[in-house]
A protein has these predicted regions:
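A short, basic/flexible loop-to-alpha-helix module at the beginning of a structural domain
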Residues: 1-7
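Short, well-ordered alpha-helix to beta-strand connector turns
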Residues: 7-8, 50
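N-terminal Rossmann-like FAD-binding beta1-loop-alpha1 element of flavoenzymes
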Residues: 8-35
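Conserved N-terminal/central alpha/beta ligand/cofactor-binding core
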Residues: 2, 31-32, 38-150
Length: 150
């Protein structure tokens, strides 16, 4: 996000997890916010995520005795696909704090941690709900609606 707070206004394109995170941050900091999505309802592909959300060095991992780091996550990420080390590192360094932000800010249960393909440590977080992507995204949508009503 190019805006440095205090920011008076912002436009968010996309109503998935990233867009809703941006919209929540803008609204929470008092910015007038316009959210644009190509669909008639928000959520995007994020609502379809059935495995969970990846994060390294989180409280949930530490509570389960799982050793992980942003460096290990970055190495795993760079093993596949296009090589953009600076973007992979940015993603992985922020992944743990982002998962914890979701848990703390939106009171989400992301305490279950699994090791999925391509990962050398368990780092895919989810709660007890059947569809974690939908649960996470809807929590952010509800908060945007709540803040917008004020």
């Amino acid at each position: 996000m190019a805006c440095v707070f205090p920011c008076q206004q912002g436009i968010v394109v996309g109503g998935g997890l990233a867009g809703m995170s941006a919209a929540n941050t803008l609204l929470e900091n008092g910015a007038k916010t316009v959210l644009i999505d190509k669909s008639s309802f928000c959520g995007g592909n994020s609502t379809k995520a059935t495995s969970g959300i990846n994060g390294s060095a989180t409280r949930s991992q530490k509570n389960k005795g799982i050793e992980d780091s942003a460096q290990l996550f970055t190495a795993d990420t760079l093993k596949g696909g296009a090589k953009r080390p600076e973007l992979a590192e940015l993603l992985c360094v922020n992944s743990g704090p982002d998962v914890e932000w979701l848990m703390d800010k939106f009171n989400l249960d992301l305490s279950l941690v699994a090791r999925l393909g391509g990962h050398s440590a368990p780092r895919t977080h989810r709660g007890k709900e059947r569809f974690p992507g939908m649960t996470i995204t809807y929590a952010l949508i509800q908060m945007v609606e709540k803040i917008s009503e004020k």
